[in-house]
């Protein structure tokens, strides 16, 4: 049993399709909204929605921070997730970290997307590669969390 619970951590989950329906219901046209250049994430942070994105971010962090760790990731998606988990369960998985995305190719190819997979992937890649922050540790937003104690127990937050 887990020593803490997260049952209250999420209030709602929406797919892009549901978000689009809300926009339509409230007559919101995203193309008429003022454009804002959001460039506070590294290319690695922006790629979390694609299979292998989290693994790439961790590899970049390990390389840049100099931390010594035996990182043997197994990025997997789609039906391969079940096979990967079964191999891990019986001790036959060659890695020590599983990045599992239930949707083949990651969230960008999920059931709730509103664009064809190839078009979504191309747009995703173009936007992500346009970022000026090319390393995890170069993200200035991290400075806002320097005082966060990652060793605390959840009961200490109360």
Regions from the language model: what does each represent?
Residues 1-158:
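Iron-sulfur-associated redox domains of electron-transfer enzymes in respiratory
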